[in-house]
Amino acid sequence: VIYIVFVVLIVAMVFSLKYAWWKPAVDWKRPRVLMYHMVREHIDGAKFNKLRVKPAEFDKQVAWMKAQGFHFVTMQELQDNWGNHPEKTVAITFDDGYLDNLENAFPILEKYQAKATIYVVVDRHDRDWSTYKKAHHNSGELAHEPKLNDIQVKQLSNSGLIEIGSHTMTHANLSKLDDVASLKELTESKHQIEALIAKPVTSFAYPFGIYSQRDVELAKQAGYSNAVTTKEGIDSISPDFMQLQRIKISGKDSLFAVKLRLKLGKRA
């Protein structure tokens, strides 16, 4: 009996250290911004399965948020009403513009009437942008992922649930570009997406989360009013709208882990 109690205590300690469920929640008046990429089944042996949230898991996550009374907003709505949102406001975001955002994620969002923002790379087809960050990531895995075509982007934009934002022309690593090239990535993508959806594009996501103060200023110059990073956390009541933090949702997270991330803002 003593042995069993000892084992249970050890397991409980390990669980508590891993998940820190006991930590107090970040004030629920502070909105949460979630970062997703794909909603699709995992690929055996694939490098980027952490970017792939299984549809059944995504359904559970959105269903739980809905049941808990979360208020879903787009990024522009988040900015426009900052400080006046109800408790438990959440902005779901997707990076890159994968086809599964329409085929798998959108029906779930529609089912729960949950709004989201999709940051689209303009030149997104057959492009292995993972090599722009790390040259050895040259497997072509992301290049082979089907992307949204322009008609589908417009369809999502007209759905009433989806805001389309920019993720540059080529998913560029802005840190490797000079001022002129960086500004072109920012402005051209904005203009082309606006021409496609016939709406202003005001929301932006820094590719790879790699950026400097120069890029913040260039994004403002290009006409964006808010931008998200990959820095994990929950912003304060008075945030820098051009450097908003997000909560990363991994394809390897359990629902329990996702709940804790929403509570604490990052992996415990």
What are these model-derived regions, one by one?
Residues 113-135:
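A short, conserved beta-to-alpha structural element at the edge of catalytic cores
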Residues 164-172:
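Histidine-centered catalytic micro-motifs
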Residues 92-93, 164:
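Residue-level marker for buried hydrophobic side chains located in beta-strands
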Residues 51-55, 138-147:
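A short acidic, glycine-rich active-site loop
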Residues 92, 131-144, 171-178:
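Surface-exposed cleft-lining segments at the edges of enzyme active sites
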Residues 1-92, 100, 159, 176-268:
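C-terminal active-site subregion of NodB/CE4 polysaccharide deacetylases
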Residues 97-103:
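Short acidic, Gly/Ser-rich segments with clustered Asp/Glu that frequently serve as metal-coordination loops
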Residues 66, 107-113, 146-165, 220:
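Acidic (Asp/Glu)-rich catalytic clusters
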